[in-house]
Amino acid sequence: MNNILSEEVLNVTDFTTSRQLTLWKREDLQSSQLDDVAEEVPVALVYNGISHVVMMASPKDLTHFAMGFSLSEGIIDSPREIYGMDVVPSCNGLEVQIDLSSRRFMGLKARRRALAGRTGCGVCGVEQLNDIGKPVQPLPFSQTFNLGNLDRALKHLNDFQPTGKLTGCTHAAAWVMPSGELAGGHEDVGRHVALDKLLGRRATEGEEWRQGAALVSSRASYEMVQKSAMCGVEILFAVSAATTLAVDVAERCNLTLVGFCKPGRATIYTHPQRLIAD
């Protein structure tokens, strides 16, 4: 297997396709021209030779995605339980081939047996209703964030959406340092995938990524809250709103959930004690 974080560095245009489109403007006649459209491909996560899940995603930063998904879905507890990854083409998309520890692979196979024979998928990957919104353990209260620094993060969030700037078709997830500086970020056509990419990268970065908060360009659904909590993120900022279930899960797992983040304002849904207001 290749090194866990090995992936070819590509240009942003590698993740878009030019298509002949018809544009309409009130003041003009219809016209046909080339425009950029974001790539979306099926990505299979294959653990020790067995395909576990197929997700639709942007075809970049896929090792980060696989790491984040494995952590946020409870397949692993530590990056050390993945020994290596390869991203390879398949007939209809891409595969991330993951070399998983034997102990974790046995647990994954047990989960697959528990799901076998069931039909329907209201909440994919959840085995029973009681499992919804139940993180491994409540989060500690070890982080604080000065809301006066949020404006800086919001100003630069688009810097991590180069494909989005071309196509208007991606979500972003970024890691906000206590100063408001963005340490890094990822984009994807899927908001959950963008967050998984960020969580996977955070798990393999240094100690400086332990402090701060996650910022997403989308709404905050319960899955976003649960994924964050599973990876030890104590504060989640969302540009859009939160759902009722997201608020309930955040309250239960001690996560500070903040929505409608705009310059100079925000809506704090849960656990405001982590936040400092100048």
From Swiss-Prot:
One of its GO terms (biological process) is Mo-molybdopterin cofactor biosynthetic process. Mo-bis(molybdopterin guanine dinucleotide) binds at residues 260-265. It is found in: Cytoplasm. One of its GO terms (molecular function) is sulfur carrier activity. Keywords: Cytoplasm, Molybdenum cofactor biosynthesis. SUPFAM superfamilies: Cytidine deaminase-like. One of its GO terms (cellular component) is cytoplasm. The active site is at 121 (cysteine persulfide intermediate). The keyword Cytoplasm applies. Belongs to the FdhD family. This is Sulfur carrier protein FdhD. It comes from Salmonella typhi. The lineage of its organism: Bacteria, Pseudomonadati, Pseudomonadota, Gammaproteobacteria, Enterobacterales.
